[in-house]
Amino acid sequence: MLNLSEQWLEMPLAPHGTTRFHYVWLRDNCHCSECRHPDTKERILATASIPTTIAPTQAEIGETALTVVWNDQQHVSEYPLQWLLAHDYATAPPETDVAKPKVKLWGRELQAEIPRFDYQTLHSDESAMLAWCEAVRDIGLTVVENAPLVEGEIERFAETVAVVRETIYDRLHNVRATPGEYNAYNVASTTLELKPHTDMPNYNNPPGVQMFHFLVNESEGGESTAVDGFKVAADLLARDPQAYQTLATTPVEFRMFSSRGDIQSSNPLLTLDHSGELNVFRFSNQLAQPARISAEQMSEFYRAYQLLGQMIEDPSYKIEFRMKTGDIMVTNNLRVLHGRNSYDANSGARHLQLSYMDFDDVLSRIRMLKQAQSGAS
């Protein structure tokens, strides 16, 4: 039943059929108390200490586990068959992360279908909290309704999900507009149209989740806008692969500075993961610094950059909606661009409070809620 070769063993593993596991991988993943801490389950064994000649002196498949005796000090390892099945990398390994995003691209059609949730229900119903976290993960835009009109409530809401991500704006940021008063310190604090953008591209690791709590929204105009950057990027790749490649490889410098700090970064607008999939979309024309790339790259970069900007402004991608007093708009800041229309500051007051979380914390919350549902750990 077992076939031992020089570097791996082959074994039957229903329902996968015959599969193989490398000796070094098996030895590295021994879960005995000498190799893993019995309480924390963290690895104690130093992977670098495993001999290059590691191999079994004995191996046996039982009803529920594979047992291996190693030529390294006759160490004995036991691997439950269900664990091997879950980690079988040789025969199309299944996706085991229950929090892995199931991205749903969208355009103008989402305007009538924005996922909406009730604030109090999210606090009292874990299934509602799970649905909300999954909507933030998969769609990247939600509205939470009926939040208390209390300053600092957005910070408390964030802490029911995970932890607040501090930035140059601190834990909580106020955006106010009062009739007869004017204090512009950035574009967002003016009455001008705020073009769709992502926040904090000047960070190498931008905050992944952005939350706007509308404490007062009485002015005329100022409708919120949003664009799915991943949808724009997917269509750009299909339409102009060269432009996509340019934006995925050319660094763009962003900077934000104040009395609290001077945060700068240089990254492509489209950041790809190890498999070539888009995982971060950065775009903030107001924070972009003068391009410092070679003369040979400049024309192609601007061609691609302008094309991207034109697509972002295309009505087929942009949605527009009115936020009510008491609403919280939540976006995946690594994907969804947000903005607003211009407004009349003399027509009524406007007060928003803004806070951030990391996207990893939303994924963590999904895992914990799923584990609670299944009773797993």
Labelled PLM ranges:
Residues 88-90, 94-141, 146-377:
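Active-site environment of non-heme Fe oxygenases that use a 2-His-1-carboxylate facial triad
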Residues 1-125:
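Motif-centric detector for short Cys/His coordination patterns
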